[in-house]
Amino acid sequence: MPRYLEGWIKDVVENAKRRPYVSRSREKPVLQIIPRIRAVKGAGLNPVIAEYKRKSPSGFSEDRDPISYAKSMEQGGAVAISVITENTVFGGSYEYLERIARNVKIPLLMKDFVVSENQVDTAYDLGADFVLLIVRILTERELSGLLEYVRSYGMEALVEVHDREDLDIALRSGASLIGVNSRDLFSLTIQKEMAMKLLEQIPSTVTKVAESGIESAEEIRLLREKGADAFLIGSSLMRNPDKIKEFVQG
């Protein structure tokens, strides 16, 4: 059994299992996120994955048009866009992903509580290029199986961890792209020091993404010093999209 599957997380996962597969005819090739992160980093810029979300359990709430937001992030230099598709707690939808995929030319992350191959099928069909897999809501066997299934489409998985045990599982499963979430999904608290220590423990062969609570270019610089290769930023950019250039160039 996964170590953390209770309370609101359990409800969200159960809902994810019930959501039907959405079939579409994919209209674009899969874009590879890891080489793009390396290219942006190599150019002396910060690879920012800009997130589109409507709300979250932490109390965040913001209503922006998905297309105009995504285009502004692309124009501002974001390496990719994360689209939350979880529909009960985060106010996301598959429609947002599909619409954004038709309007931008940078990689898209389907950010959801992915627990089934049907969700991966949906991600591919709607135009995602990489998919979030959260270690804490999956068994190690499930994680390995879903990682292999995601890659069978030519996509990549952003494997999210929060502590050393999560990281060990992610590494054993063969993750190439690991996201360190400073927010504990269960308590919703931000633990930045713990996240920074975890970033330092990830092998250099793995591409590392710092997630949650990033509010300034100074924080990005500090996370970069700790080994982060890319930065997933949601609330700060949703509140003030103009920050994207500062974050990319800072």
Curated annotation (Swiss-Prot):
SUPFAM superfamilies xrefs: Ribulose-phoshate binding barrel (SSF51366)
Database matches in Pfam families: IGPS
Gene Ontology biological process terms in this record: L-tryptophan biosynthetic process
Keyword Glycosyltransferase: no
Pathways involved: Amino-acid biosynthesis; L-tryptophan biosynthesis; L-tryptophan from chorismate: step 4/5
Transmembrane region(s): none
EC number: 4.1.1.48
Catalytic reactions of this protein: 1-(2-carboxyphenylamino)-1-deoxy-D-ribulose 5-phosphate + H(+) = (1S,2R)-1-C-(indol-3-yl)glycerol 3-phosphate + CO2 + H2O
Gene3D superfamilies registered for this protein in UniProt: Aldolase class I
GO MF term list: indole-3-glycerol-phosphate synthase activity; phosphoribosylanthranilate isomerase activity
Highest taxon in the source lineage: Archaea
Similarity-based family: Belongs to the TrpC family.
PANTHER family: INDOLE-3-GLYCEROL-PHOSPHATE SYNTHASE, TRYPTOPHAN BIOSYNTHESIS PROTEIN
HAMAP family linked: IGPS_A
Name of the molecule in the record: Indole-3-glycerol phosphate synthase
Name of the gene: trpC
